[in-house]
C-alpha cells in the first residue's frame, strides 16, 4: 500500500501501472490453516512495451503494452510497422497506461514487464473483462424481477414484466426502463480483489473471487482505485 505524507499528492488512480493478460480459469488455494480460498488464475506473463509516450512528443506520459501472440497474417501493415519499430512481437491485445512522466521514462520500447514488479501478494486490484454473453433474456433473468402467479386465474402471464408505463399521459416509455433484451457481452470491472499469490516464474496472478468473462478471455489488471487504507497508514 502506498503511503503518502500529509503535504504530498497521492498518485492519481489513472496514473497507475497495470498489466494485460488472459483469464486462465478458477481453482482453489489452501492456506497453512487449512482454509480454502477460491481464486481466479490470470496469465499476465510477457507484457511487452510497444511504445513510450512523453509530454514533449505526445502531450502526456504513458506506456503502451501488448500481451499474447498473433499470426503474421492477422497483423495489418500499420500494426506490423508499429511492432517492428518497438522491437516487440505482435500481440493479441494493446493497452495504454497513463503514468507520471518520471515513471514512464523508466521504460523502453521492447522491454518486458515482470508481474512481480507491479503486483504483490496482499495487494488489492481491479480486473476488467468482457462478461459472458447470455443472448436475449427476459426481465426475470436479466433484472431479477419476480414472477407472476403460477395459477389462480393466471394462464399466460407467468414471466411477463407487467406494466411498463402509464396511459396517454405521458404517452411514452421512460428511458432506462428495465425490460427484456440482450444480456451480457459488455465490459465490466470487478473492484478490490485480493491478490492471494504471485507466481513470478510463470507470470501468473491469483486473485480471490471471480472476474468477468470466459476462460481465455482478455483482462486488464490495475491497482485498486478504491482500496481501503490500512490502519495506521
From Swiss-Prot:
The record's region (Disordered) falls at 146-171
Give the matching Gene3D superfamilies. 3.30.160.810, Translation factors
What's in the keyword line of the UniProt record?
Methylation, Ribonucleoprotein, Ribosomal protein, RNA-binding, rRNA-binding
| One Pfam family in the UniProt entry | Ribosomal_L3
Offer one example of a GO biological process linked to this entry.
translation
Mark the residues carrying the PTM N5-methylglutamine.
168
Keyword Repeat present in the record's keywords: the answer is: no
**Processing after translation:** Methylated by PrmB.
InterPro entries noted in UniProt: Ribosomal_uL3 (IPR000597), Ribosomal_uL3_bac/org-type (IPR019927), Ribosomal_uL3_CS (IPR019926), Transl_B-barrel_sf (IPR009000)
Question: GO terms for molecular function, please?
Answer: rRNA binding; structural constituent of ribosome
Question: PANTHER family per the record?
Answer: 50S RIBOSOMAL PROTEIN L3 (PTHR11229), LARGE RIBOSOMAL SUBUNIT PROTEIN UL3C (PTHR11229:SF16)
Q: What is the protein's quaternary organization?
A: Part of the 50S ribosomal subunit. Forms a cluster with proteins L14 and L19.
Q: Which family does it belong to?
A: Belongs to the universal ribosomal protein uL3 family.
- The name of this protein is Large ribosomal subunit protein uL3
Taxonomic classification: Bacteria, Pseudomonadati, Pseudomonadota, Betaproteobacteria, Burkholderiales
Amino acid at each position: 500500500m502506498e503511503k503518502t505524507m500529509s503535504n504530498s499528492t497521492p498518485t492519481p488512480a489513472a496514473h497507475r501501472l497495470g498489466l494485460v493478460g488472459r483469464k486462465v480459469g478458477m481453482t482453489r488455494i489452501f492456506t497453512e490453516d487449512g482454509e480454502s480460498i477460491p481464486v481466479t488464475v490470470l496469465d499476465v506473463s510477457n507484457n511487452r512495451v510497444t511504445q513510450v509516450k512523453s509530454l514533449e512528443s505526445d502531450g502526456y506520459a504513458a506506456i503502451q503494452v501488448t500481451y499474447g501472440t498473433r499470426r503474421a497474417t492477422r497483423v495489418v501493415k500499420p500494426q506490423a510497422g508499429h511492432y517492428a519499430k518497438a522491437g516487440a512481437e505482435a500481440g493479441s491485445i494493446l493497452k495504454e497506461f497513463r503514468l507520471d512522466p518520471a515513471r514512464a521514462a523508466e521504460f523502453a520500447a521492447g522491454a518486458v514487464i515482470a508481474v512481480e514488479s507491479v503486483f504483490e501478494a496482499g495487494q488489492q486490484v481491479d480486473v476488467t473483462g468482457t462478461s459472458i454473453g447470455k443472448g436475449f433474456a427476459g426481465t426475470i433473468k436479466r433484472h431479477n424481477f419476480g414472477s407472476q402467479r403460477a395459477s389462480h386465474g393466471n394462464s399466460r402471464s407467468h414471466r411477463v414484466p407487467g406494466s411498463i408505463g402509464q396511459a396517454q399521459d405521458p404517452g411514452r416509455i421512460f428511458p432506462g426502463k428495465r425490460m427484456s433484451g440482450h444480456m451480457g457481452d459488455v465490459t465490466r470491472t470487478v473492484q478490490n480483489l485480493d491478490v492471494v499469490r504471485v507466481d513470478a516464474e510463470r507470470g501468473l496472478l491469483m486473485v480471490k473471487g471471480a472476474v468477468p468473462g470466459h476462460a481465455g478471455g482478455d483482462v486488464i489488471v490495475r491497482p485498486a482505485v478504491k482500496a481501503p487504507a490500512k490502519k495506521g497508514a
